[in-house]
Structures are given as C-alpha cells and as structure tokens.
Amino acid sequence: MARVTVEDAVNQIGNRFDMILVAARRARQIAVQGKDPMVEEENDKPTVIALREIELGLVTADTLDADERQTVREREAAEIAAVAAIAEGRNTI
C-alpha cells in the first residue's frame, strides 16, 4: 500500500477542506461511476488514487466540474435521441 502525504495535495488545491471535497468526488467517480484512474492503480484504494491524482495536478475542482458537465450533456443527448427515435416510430405508423 502506498503512503500518501496530503501536503502536496493540499498545496495543489489550496486548502485542506477543498482538497477533501475534491478527493471525495474523484474517489466516488473511480469507485462508483467506474471512471478510469489517471495514474497507475498499484493495488490502491480509490481515495489513495484520488489523492495521487491531485498531487500530480491531474484533478482539480474545475476538471471535476467540466467532467460532470460533459456527462450531463452526453446523457441529455442520449435522451433526446431516444425521444426522437420514439417520435420517428410513431410518424411511420
């Protein structure tokens, strides 16, 4: 198991409290949403992976927000396409 000091992660984010929020969001993405880690897993838990990504500057609150907006746009586009397909099916009857 990797030993992670949070000082580098805190320095990347700015303060300890925001770092915790960013790390929790990223760990949840990895563990629950199935997002791929940006660093080697090395048999680490999602929280450790999230902290390592933050330390390297790969993850910030802004990158998480942008990723979330992209996910919402993709979901909305899929819903619109599904509705259009249903409407198209009704028009051909």
UniProtKB/Swiss-Prot annotation:
Source organism, top-level taxon: Bacteria
GO molecular function: DNA binding; DNA-directed RNA polymerase activity
GO cellular component: DNA-directed RNA polymerase complex
BP terms from Gene Ontology: DNA-templated transcription
Reaction catalyzed: RNA(n) + a ribonucleoside 5'-triphosphate = RNA(n+1) + diphosphate
Keywords: DNA-directed RNA polymerase, Nucleotidyltransferase, Transcription, Transferase
EC supergroup of this enzyme: transferase
Gene3D superfamilies with a match to the protein in the record: 3.90.940.10
Family (UniProt): Belongs to the RNA polymerase subunit omega family.
Function: Promotes RNA polymerase assembly. Latches the N- and C-terminal regions of the beta' subunit thereby facilitating its interaction with the beta and alpha subunits.
Annotated PANTHER family: DNA-DIRECTED RNA POLYMERASE SUBUNIT OMEGA (PTHR34476:SF1)
Protein name as annotated: DNA-directed RNA polymerase subunit omega
